[in-house]
């Protein structure tokens, strides 16, 4: 998707910093996604898009994946996440979310869910 990535220096710097200090769940999820393990789909980590940084993104499939830690539990954060997901969907990126707990405890189920999301047709 040409022109989708956000090249503002602030976001690029933030994304680089996030790549150097991933959470345990992000490390585990990256192990599932890297090197085209899911039917050859290529994912990137900490991708600046539309004013946000998406934890993992497959641009060709229009799919973003978020690893949500405990900070995503309160109502205010849930509303922000919903608005963020809607803004990214408007740019052609569907967001799916997994809790850090699920990523660490049920990686096979997470991998299956990602595979199903990749198989779905992206919204128009």
PLM-predicted stretches and their roles:
Residues 1-42, 90, 119-124:
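Solvent-exposed, charged helical/coil patches
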Residues 12-23, 45-121:
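Basic, amphipathic alpha-helical patches used to engage nucleic acids or provide basic targeting signals
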């Amino acid at each position: 998707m040409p022109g989708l990535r956000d090249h503002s220096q602030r976001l690029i710097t933030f994304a680089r910093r996030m790549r150097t200090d991933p959470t345990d769940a992000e490390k585990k999820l990256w192990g599932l996604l890297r090197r085209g393990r899911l039917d050859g789909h290529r994912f990137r980590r900490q991708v600046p898009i539309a004013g946000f940084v998406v934890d993992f993104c497959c641009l060709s499939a229009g799919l973003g994946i978020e690893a949500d830690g405990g900070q995503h539990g309160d109502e205010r954060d849930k509303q922000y996440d919903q608005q963020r997901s809607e803004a990214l969907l408007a740019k052609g990126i569907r967001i799916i979310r997994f809790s850090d707990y699920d990523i660490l405890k049920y990686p096979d189920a997470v991998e299956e869910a990602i595979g199903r999301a990749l198989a779905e047709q992206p919204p128009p």
